[in-house]
Amino acid sequence: MADFVGSWKYGDSENMEAYLKKLGISSDMVDKILNAKPEFTFTLEGNQMTIKMVSSLKTKITTFTFGEEFKEETADGKTAMTTVTKDSESKMTQVTTGPEYTTHVVREVVGDKMIATWTVGDVKAVTTLLKA
């Protein structure tokens, strides 16, 4: 998981608007999210990872232990249960179950890029972060 550790800046995204709308997020909030251009810092201590996301909308810090379910707040302010598992040293899968949906996010580090594939129902989006 050391490949994830460090700072990452927003690169680009594909189909994120459709993904956010599928989650039921309002058009106004979708526009704000798409223009936020977040930066991330990943830290790792043993089997526990912390992801700090800083954007023009807010700062969010999420700490979790791989393989253990935890409660978190979604982008639209709802409570959801999430589990993150290690697939390899450079790949992790996040499954989040909220009141109306289940999402999957697969993050993989390839060179100096982190590719995240977001899925809800039949809608997929991809975001790319660049090593800062």
UniProtKB/Swiss-Prot annotation:
Record-linked InterPro entries: Calycin, Fatty_acid-bd, ILBP, Lipocln_cytosolic_FA-bd_dom
Keywords: Acetylation, Lipid-binding, Transport
Signal peptide annotation: none
Organism placement in taxonomy: Eukaryota, Metazoa, Spiralia, Lophotrochozoa, Platyhelminthes
Protein name: Fatty acid-binding protein 1
Residues annotated as transmembrane: none
Domain of life: Eukaryota
Residue positions, PTM N-acetylalanine: 2
Source organism (scientific name): Fasciola gigantica
Family the entry assigns: Belongs to the calycin superfamily. Fatty-acid binding protein (FABP) family.
